[in-house]
Amino acid sequence: MNFRQLIFKILYNENNMKKFLLKPKKSLGQNFILSSEITKKIVALAGSLENFNVIEIGPGYGALTREILVHNPKSLLSIEKDRDLVKHHDQLLNEHQGKYRIIEADALHIIEEELIERPVKVIANLPYNISVALFLKWLDSIKFFTSLTLMFQKEVADRITARPNSKDYGPLSVLSQLLCDIKKEFDIEPKEFFPRPKIHSSVITVNPLPTPKFVVNLETLIKLIRAVFAQRRKMLRNSLQNITNHAETVLENAKLSGNERPENLTIEQFCLLANNVECLLCNKMY
């Protein structure tokens, strides 16, 4: 065991955390990583960091932060909402002056482009209570990022990476995979965290595409997938009635029978449907 591993074992030990550190705040979705092997695996998935600025969300006591800094990024910016935890980063700030900074802020309300320069990689153990909202926020400006290596609740990771004809496939799957190449890398058991959550976690890698996989008006697509997945057990000819009075025409032009359910459609088929709805709205079909 080298010195760094020894320090990690002492600092991020469940018993020591219970005795000496602040009680995690459930309201902030705090679950701290206990395993140095896991932090190593997460950071390794992000690839070389030497020429990249890195953003970390919810650094907690700095387990993942320390591993990121070992890989010598151009700079590291951590965003932490908990003021009490920000104070625990004084030593890291002193050790990595000019390279590391931490901001007390709500990650949902920051504008990354104003805080850090490209190229940017995100590496984060996301707070459970904001993970989906934060990921959707990033999808809205996805081209700003080179890559994202993210830990989610397993159920959220399953929704993001789900394929057609599965129970987890939905709006989050369609939108994410339209804009990015996404891969689920590995699952993590509750015992690897303090406090121990009741659910498993998963790490995914997200690589933004230069352009979406298919040409589509994103606003129309989002309205479409929200409408049809809100009634996911209904056939398309019925669920489409919520967004157009010409469902049969839209289905015919998209070469669909209307008997399909939302979970049966590929991303390409959703984009084709959305484009036909858009044409109707613009009166281009007649």
From Swiss-Prot:
Reactions this protein catalyses: adenosine(1518)/adenosine(1519) in 16S rRNA + 4 S-adenosyl-L-methionine = N(6)-dimethyladenosine(1518)/N(6)-dimethyladenosine(1519) in 16S rRNA + 4 S-adenosyl-L-homocysteine + 4 H(+)
Keyword line: Cytoplasm, Methyltransferase, RNA-binding, rRNA processing, S-adenosyl-L-methionine, Transferase
Enzyme Commission designation: 2.1.1.182
Residues where S-adenosyl-L-methionine binds: N31, I33, G58, E80, D106, N125
UniProt GO MF annotations: 16S rRNA (adenine(1518)-N(6)/adenine(1519)-N(6))-dimethyltransferase activity; RNA binding
GO CC, any one term: cytoplasm
Domain of life: Bacteria
Localization per Swiss-Prot or TrEMBL: Cytoplasm
Family stated for the protein in its record: Belongs to the class I-like SAM-binding methyltransferase superfamily. rRNA adenine N(6)-methyltransferase family. RsmA subfamily.
Function per UniProt: Specifically dimethylates two adjacent adenosines (A1518 and A1519) in the loop of a conserved hairpin near the 3'-end of 16S rRNA in the 30S particle. May play a critical role in biogenesis of 30S subunits.
Protein name, UniProt field: Ribosomal RNA small subunit methyltransferase A
Organism: Wolbachia pipientis wMel
Gene label: rsmA
